[in-house]
């Protein structure tokens, strides 16, 4: 009797733990995180072309938004694993009004901005899109010309 009780309790615990788990499946080679799927692409595109490339996967896909230092650390490791020496990486943040008002393409809140020292600067009044900088270990951000060609990080909800 004790053996069956133990098995029953184990099955109940397994069921309860699984019922609270997120139910989404990312495509192969995409990183699952917080109910979204992320993928870094080594193709070099302008910021706008990268955003359009992300959107082609399905409605709701965009260049990635990052909201915490924990996110930044995890993505820096992910990007470093896939890109070696390929430069900075576009993310979904830009200054559409050109007044230092930074907005995510997915319209999520702008609550985390780990800028490099003396950034953003809108250098030559020509830098309004945001990249993760490779020589900071992909941990800090810089504003750059949106026409620059960069690898990029997409996010999708699957």
From Swiss-Prot:
Localization in the cell: Secreted
GO MF entry, a single one: metal ion binding
UniProt-annotated binding residues for Ca(2+): 119, 121, 127, 142-143
Disulfide bonds: 26-37, 54-154, 61-156, 129-146
Sites where a glycan is attached: 134
Key word Phosphoprotein present: no
Matching CDD domains: CLECT_REG-1_like
Keyword 4Fe-4S part of the UniProt annotation: no
The entry's keywords: Calcium, Disulfide bond, Glycoprotein, Lectin, Metal-binding, Secreted, Signal
Coiled-coil intervals: none
Tissue expression: Expressed by the venom gland.
Purpose: Galactose-binding lectin which recognizes specific carbohydrate structures and agglutinates a variety of animal cells by binding to cell-surface glycoproteins and glycolipids. May be a calcium-dependent lectin.
Family stated for the protein in its record: Belongs to the true venom lectin family.
Quaternary structure (record): Homodimer; non-covalently linked.
Name of the protein in its database record: C-type lectin BfL-1
Organism of provenance: Bungarus fasciatus
């Amino acid at each position: 009797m004790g053996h069956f009780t133990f098995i029953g309790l184990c099955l109940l615990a397994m069921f309860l733990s699984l019922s609270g788990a997120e139910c989404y499946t990312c495509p192969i080679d995409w990183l699952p995180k917080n109910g979204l799927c992320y993928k870094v692409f080594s193709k070099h595109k302008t910021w706008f072309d990268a955003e359009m490339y992300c959107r082609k996967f399905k409605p709701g896909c965009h260049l990635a938004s990052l909201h915490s230092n924990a996110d930044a650390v995890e993505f820096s490791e992910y990007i470093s694993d896939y890109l070696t020496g390929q430069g900075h990486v576009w993310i979904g943040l830009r200054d559409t009004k050109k007044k230092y008002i930074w907005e995510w393409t997915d319209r999520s809140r702008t609550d985390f901005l780990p800028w490099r020292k003396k950034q953003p600067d809108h250098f030559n009044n020509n830098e309004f899109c945001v990249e993760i900088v490779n020589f900071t270990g992909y941990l800090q951000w810089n504003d750059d010309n949106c026409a620059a060609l960069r690898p990029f990080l997409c996010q999708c909800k699957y």
